[in-house]
């Protein structure tokens, strides 16, 4: 693999429009326990799964086309992704999160890891009938809408409250959740929670507390102390990815750095974990492209 990666990088440096690879078809060994790089067959060639080639494509910031069979092998084509890395969370402009704009093209619920990990977090929260659920930075309410799939018998009894700076995001929420028991408002979450807000049973904030235009830790402490019931749970989401040409790219990348740097992400995770543990919550962390931290009652 080292020589393959080096050759592909050289081709991209020379601004190749695509990379063509002829590789072994791994299909005959699909039911066997074989590790990538393990010698197989009479020629003792290194085994490489399609997942490895997909990972190579991601490392190169490319999109892999559908493999085409050719004489017992596969032809792979890798195409450089267009555009620039998208990091809306670093912008101070609320319109960047317009659900009808670029941000609206991103559907995290199409990521199986996101769905699986979010569901694992919800299972730790023990949501009962008539639960009150608060979302800070709600956008179009994806994290609320998906609850219908996992709580079919109690979903209609949940009441949702969501705040966001984007007027268009709040309009989307009103369309998705028209019932009068739900509350969605344009609000700066840096402000204190509304005094009339009932105590909530679950606070959700996904990819919001890391925005550069708010003091995320201070905001969280305020809402945690003033808006939640003593037995409430918390689910926080932290982006561990960016987007390039419509593809999710693994790893949190800082500006002016060509590679992922998880240092800020790890620092934030450790802060929120310690804070919630100090306040008597059981805390766990999971995730891939998005890391979830869940704090639930012990």
Where are these predicted regions, by residue range?
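N-terminal accessory interaction module
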Residues: 1-90
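Class I SAM-dependent methyltransferase Rossmann-like catalytic core
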Residues: 68-127
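Class I SAM-dependent methyltransferase SAM/SAH-binding core
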Residues: 134, 142-191
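Conserved glycine-rich SAM-binding loop
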Residues: 139
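A short acidic, Gly/Pro-enriched loop at the edge of an enzyme's catalytic core
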Residues: 194-203
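A short, conserved alpha-helix within the catalytic core of class I
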Residues: 211-223
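Conserved beta-strand signature within the Rossmann-like core of class I S-adenosyl-L-methionine
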Residues: 231-240
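Conserved Class I S-adenosyl-L-methionine
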Residues: 247-273
